[in-house]
A protein has these predicted regions:
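Metal-ion/cofactor- or nucleotide/acyl-coenzyme-handling active-site neighborhoods
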Residues: 1-180
Length: 180
């Protein structure tokens, strides 16, 4: 059976969610308020948890990762309260410290991915998640498909630098580009 998850969280007004990573900005974030917030939390990778498995500062409602399951603590996979989204090729991955495979875990969905340009990032004609080799981009695509339209990011520290060709194109179109 296929689950009907498209726009599951959509509302009349733009629906918000927290997108929680484990980058340095989480250290200065009001994690207690975020954790207590009724807004859905989408966890990415360690989602506020250290690689040593220390307790998460924010327990996600939804979780995803591009990386192998062996990198993450078993409590994420075995918790039925956390809805997990994993690439289809991870179904048979072993869960650390157990004899379970990812396909044995509760509340776990597997998806197929595809490579497509960022111009087609939100292509509703595609039934696959964008394969950008990046968990954050994957989480954005999953969140958008679930119906979220406003993302509050914490611990999501990354910088995307445009290529020289992209900067040249922007400048030729009259766009003032500032690298700071």
């Amino acid at each position: 059976a296929t689950a009907a998850l498209e726009n599951l969280y959509a509302g009349n007004d733009p629906t918000a969610c927290w997108l929680v990573g484990s980058g340095p900005s989480i250290l200065g974030a009001p994690v207690e308020q975020i954790a207590a917030s009724p807004v859905v939390k989408i966890g990415v990778n360690f989602s506020g948890r250290g690689p040593d498995g220390t307790a998460p500062r924010i327990t996600p409602d939804i979780w995803t990762s591009f990386d192998p399951t062996s990198r993450f603590h078993r409590s994420i996979f075995l918790n039925p309260r956390i809805t997990k989204f994993l690439k289809a090729d991870k179904q048979k991955d072993l869960i650390p410290g157990t004899t379970f495979k990812a396909c044995d875990c509760p509340a776990t969905y597997f998806f197929r991915s595809e490579t497509r340009g960022y111009g087609d990032f939100l292509d509703s004609r595609s039934d696959r998640i964008l394969n950008a080799l990046d968990s954050f981009i994957q989480a954005l695509d999953i969140g958008y498909r679930l119906g979220f339209r406003r993302f509050f990011c914490v611990g999501a520290d990354f910088i995307i630098r445009p290529s020289d060709a992209q900067v040249s194109l922007a400048v030729s179109c009259g766009i003032d580009f500032d690298e700071t």
